């Protein structure tokens, strides 16, 4: 019973006598339309009253204000405050982490991101991925300051760490040196949370880039060294007979060299073993007689193509008068002996006009006497003429 004698009236049967209707019923209008029952029976007595007599249509909050006395209002206010506190306490528990997340979670974010950056900088490729710090631009300035150090000369770890600390101190306090007093700042937390080893890691990340160029230079320099050792030069063996002077000016130092694809066979070893044996008309087969058939064996020796192997490289030593014989090679294969005689005469004329050529030919003839034009052809076939033609 209330103080004025009026019974308590509830819109629905009470769950507990001590509890009041919930907040949603009062403030949020969950039960704006009250179920209009004819009678309600209270728990305090057998009084039967009509709800329509004392309850007006409208919000339940107005009816509560009309029906509840002062003690009930006090209980309601206390319960509402308690319920509001119970609802606001998780909000405070949520807001206090959000207030702390403004400092500590950001610190944890920077603690998580900065090792990622150092890992990206320490990659051998040298690519740096910047993470977008939209909340604080000072972090990008710190990262750019560390990246700009890449363009400068690479210094030792101690010097680079000192220069980074000096540049960060001069940068309008954008990067604060690690202090324990400045843990609240997000920008200071980035610098305070990062240990001093971060500078060492950054310098270690830049040091491979300084090591990369000498390694690449070594790779580049080895290629021209291999080419320079070979000394590959190209000449045309076919020279017109009208201009023999261009060929006869060759000397020992001017002998043209170029690499051949084939390998030297046993005939070259025979040439080295027997350098003084002249090549006569009886040794080669009939098909090769067109190349060798001349008045004197000295002419065949002097006008031969010499194949020499110097330091495991195969060289053609092209003498002065041999180039004229190369020009005459094609008609000699199928024609008669008349062009051979003309070629021999032209060769002898050249040797008589330029006696220096004979000295060159004699010096080269001392190396290999048996390696003539026919032997050169069979060396290309990697077979000896005796095995084929005899």
Swiss-Prot record:
Annotated disulfide bonds = none
According to the record, the segments passing through the membrane are: none
Record's superkingdom?
Answer: Eukaryota
BP GO annotations? flagellated sperm motility; spermatogenesis
This protein's UniProt keywords: Calcium, Cell projection, Cilium, Cytoplasm, Cytoplasmic vesicle, Flagellum, Membrane, Mitochondrion, Mitochondrion inner membrane, Phosphoprotein
Keyword flag Calcium: yes
Q: Which GO terms describe its cellular component?
A: acrosomal vesicle; mitochondrial inner membrane; motile cilium; sperm principal piece
Fetch the InterPro entries from UniProt. Ca-bd_spermatid
According to UniProt, the tissues expressing it are described as:
Expressed in seminiferous tubules of the testis in step 10 spermatids (stage X), subsequently increasing to reach maximal levels of step 18 elongated spermatids (stage VI) (at protein level). Strongly expressed in testis. Weakly expressed in olfactory epithelium. Expressed in spermatids of seminiferous tubules at steps 4-14 (stages IV to XIV of the seminiferous epithelium classification).
* Keyword Mitochondrion (UniProt): yes
As recorded in UniProt, coiled-coil segments are none
Record field: compositional bias (Acidic residues): 162-174
Feature: compositional bias, Polar residues: 346-364
Bias (Low complexity) occurs at: 184-193
Compositional bias, Basic and acidic residues, is annotated for 330-344
Pfam families, sorted:
CABS1
- Show the segment(s) annotated as Disordered: 1-23, 82-109, 146-225, 330-390
In-chain residues carrying the UniProt-annotated modification Phosphoserine: 251, 267, 312, 346, 356, 371, 375
PANTHER family associated with the record: CALCIUM-BINDING AND SPERMATID-SPECIFIC PROTEIN 1 (PTHR22810:SF1), TESTIS DEVELOPMENT PROTEIN NYD-SP26 (PTHR22810)
Q: What is this protein called?
A: Calcium-binding and spermatid-specific protein 1
């Amino acid at each position: 019973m209330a103080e004025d004698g009026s019974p308590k009236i509830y819109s629905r049967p009470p769950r507990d006598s001590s509890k009041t209707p919930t907040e949603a019923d009062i403030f949020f209008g969950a039960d704006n339309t009250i179920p209009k029952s004819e009678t309600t029976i209270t728990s305090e007595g057998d009084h039967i009253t009509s709800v329509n007599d004392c309850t007006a249509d409208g919000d339940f909050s107005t009816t509560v204000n009309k029906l509840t006395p002062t003690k009930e209002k006090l209980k309601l206010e206390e319960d509402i405050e308690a319920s509001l506190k119970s609802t606001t306490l998780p909000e405070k528990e949520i807001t206090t982490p959000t207030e702390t997340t403004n400092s500590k979670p950001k610190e944890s974010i920077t603690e998580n991101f900065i090792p990622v950056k150092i890992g990206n900088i320490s990659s051998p490729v040298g690519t740096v991925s910047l993470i977008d710090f939209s909340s604080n631009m000072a972090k990008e300035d710190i990262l750019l300051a560390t990246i700009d150090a890449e363009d400068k000369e690479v210094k030792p770890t101690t010097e680079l760490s000192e220069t980074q600390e000096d540049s960060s101190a001069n940068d309008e306090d954008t990067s604060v040196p690690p202090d324990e007093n400045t843990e609240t700042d997000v920008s200071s937390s980035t610098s305070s949370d990062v240990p001093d080893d971060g500078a060492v890691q950054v310098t270690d990340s830049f040091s491979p880039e300084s090591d990369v160029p000498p390694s690449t230079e070594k790779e580049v320099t080895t290629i021209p060294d291999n080419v320079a050792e070979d000394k590959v030069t190209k000449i045309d063996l076919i020279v017109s007979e009208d201009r023999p002077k261009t060929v006869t000016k060759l000397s020992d130092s001017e002998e043209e060299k170029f690499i051949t694809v084939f390998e030297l066979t046993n005939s070259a070893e025979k040439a080295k073993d027997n350098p003084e044996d002249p090549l006569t008309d009886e040794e080669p087969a009939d098909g090769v007689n067109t190349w060798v058939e001349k008045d004197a064996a000295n002419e065949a020796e002097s006008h031969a193509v010499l194949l020499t192997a110097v330091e495991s490289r195969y060289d053609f030593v092209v003498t002065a008068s041999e180039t004229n014989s190369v020009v005459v090679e094609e008609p000699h294969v199928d024609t008669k002996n008349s062009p051979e005689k003309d070629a021999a005469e032209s060769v002898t004329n050249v040797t008589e006009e330029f006696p220096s050529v004979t000295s060159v030919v004699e010096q080269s003839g001392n190396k290999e006497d048996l390696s003539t034009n026919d032997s050169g052809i069979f060396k290309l076939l990697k077979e000896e003429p005796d095995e084929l033609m005899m």
